[in-house]
Amino acid sequence: MSDIIWPEGFVPGFTDNFCSNEVIVVGLSAKEIWPLLNTPAQCPTYYANSANPRFYDDKGPELTDGVRFYFETFGFPVESQCVECVAPVAGQPARLAWHGWAGEGETRLDVHHAWLIEDLSENRVRILTQESQKGNPAKELANTKPNPMINGHQEWLDDLVAAARKAK
């Protein structure tokens, strides 16, 4: 199975917070999952913790390398830039990642949120999402119990799978 590709400064273990969530399900493919993630306007239709996505510079509706976009999640307005966008093809995992940021100074939060969608044998698909965070808000999130990032991302995965099954 494949791994997330981490940019310098966001390698897990060297940041203020990190979360990892994964599901492996039967009966879906990376190609069925991809449009639900790569089209930000789709996310609020199945995941309650995503709101008000929009693109800048007349881009969109799908993410591409370098495109700037905005959305709201976990109570944060998040400015974002897509830094990795590899659509699913046979024999290679789909990859999607963005750098997101919110706040300034002591309230600044920087994240690298990455997704890996990988077809497996026996009609299974693996969906891995990992997020590495820096800044005081990340430190607070790391110490919050129950962990809102782990729980929120698990909900996103579960809702993503349900939406893909419904779309079949």
Question: Model-predicted segments: where are they?
Answer:
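Hydrophobic-ligand binding "helix-grip"
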Residues: 45, 73-126, 132-134
